Amino acid sequence: MRLISKRRIRFIVFILFGVLTVFVVSRLVVHFQYNQEIKFYKKYFQQRKDGLHEIYNPLEIKQIPKETIDDLYTARLDKELKNGEVIEWSKFAYVNYVTNADYLCNTLIIFNDLKQEFETKAKLVLLISKDLLDPNTSSNVAYISSLLNKIQAIDEDQVVIKLIDNIVKPKDTTPWNESLTKLLVFNQTEFDRVIYLDNDAILRSSLDELFFLPNYIKFAAPLTYWFLSNSDLEKSYHETRHREKQPINLQSYTKVLTKRIGKGQMIYNHLPSLPHSLYLNSNNIAQDIISSTSSLSPLFDFQSSKKVGKLKFASNLMVINPSKEAFDEIVNVMLPKILNKKEKYDMDLINEEMYNLKKIIYKQFIFFRKVRKLFKPEVLVLPFARYGLLTGSLRNPRHYSIIYNDVLGYKTLDNDGNDIPVGLNDSVAYSKYIHFSDYPLAKPWNYPSMKEFECIVKEEDAEDSKLEHQACDLWNSVYASYIQSREICLV
């Protein structure tokens, strides 16, 4: 057997070293170029945002405060009232999906509240598994049919019931093996915009205002705030105030936004930004942009921290502009990647394939560099205390400081820069959608009565008895309201 000569080995090593050198040098050049451009555009948008029209900042992911959402809705209603610009409510829909009969009562409760109590004019769309109405696969078809009749009777025209095929993960025996069926919401293309809701939740007010987010936004949702610590919050405040040199008082943003909405001006660049420290791997945006795409980045990403961003989009409430193109990509490209992976479900696909926060920055910046005036952002972050609160947070004191200020990196301060005291009851009073999540506690319909799972303070273990009693009372009131609502499902 002929051995490779030393000369040939040296030649191969030389070639490999040359390739490596070219790669590293080119990466450093790109890194330097990106850094220079990013510095320029950060300064550009800070100094010129007041006068910009149809030019959007690609270097940020924006959060929209609840006050601004309400201002947009009020402005749209005023156009209808004063200018006769009629809202086509048939182009909007609330959407639920049901693959488990135990959840169907919840849809009846939510749809009935939306129509009868909150008086929405939007369509109410239920995507329900065909299997639930098949006697060969379902043991309670009669009960399911009676609930469906009640749902349809809410309004014969406004309620739309669609029979669907489940998207099932093969060889997955977990309770979430059909959760990918949720992705069918992206295919409801007869509507311009839909509000998707998980129905294991309590709805406390209309969400109609979410239909009137800026038209260019294709996806908006709250974030998984429960992964954050108080240390993360403090870092985000420090980043906003010191590194970005922006005010952290949320009112300084909402006041400007209110005026701009009143004048019909662009608002995107004036929205508070999501602090980079919460979702990027380093303090250097250029570094993260490069590492977002380079297949060799694990080998050559010397400067990047290995810290993984804690924040993701929650998928229990989503505002979506459905499109055939997006759904085709989900079916043909994204689903095959995840179907056979263990412990990967709807939220994983949405955050890893569709709306990965880190990759969003990369895609925005690259597109902006190519055709600046054609770039439009597609995502917004919704305030989670109003649209994505978990019941578990009501009993978790570590979450209180987070839900008091649900635009991350910012606080509601008075004119002297002091925190405006916000109590737990006040914070929850603004919550419109509260998701049942108290693991290891089961969902409330699995218990014969409230007594089986009600919150009771153990005085001997209480660190702050008054606060814990307040939290328990609040938690119990949420569940008691739901238990009472279930009476509508009796047949």
UniProtKB/Swiss-Prot annotation:
**GO molecular function, one example?**
glycosyltransferase activity
* Chain ranges on the Lumenal side, renumbered to this chain: 32-491
- One biological process term in Gene Ontology: protein N-linked glycosylation
The UniProt entry lists membrane topology as: Single-pass type II membrane protein
Q: Where is this motif: DXD?
A: 198-200
E.C. numbers:
2.4.1.-
| Gene3D superfamilies, alphabetized | Spore Coat Polysaccharide Biosynthesis Protein SpsA, Chain A
SUPFAM superfamilies xrefs: Nucleotide-diphospho-sugar transferases (SSF53448)
Other facts: Present with 238 molecules/cell in log phase SD medium.
* Function (record text): N-acetylglucosaminyltransferase involved in the Golgi-specific modification of N-linked glycans.
Q: Which residues lie on this side of the membrane: Cytoplasmic?
A: 1-10
Q: What is this protein called?
A: Glucose N-acetyltransferase 1
A cellular component term from Gene Ontology for this protein is: Golgi medial cisterna
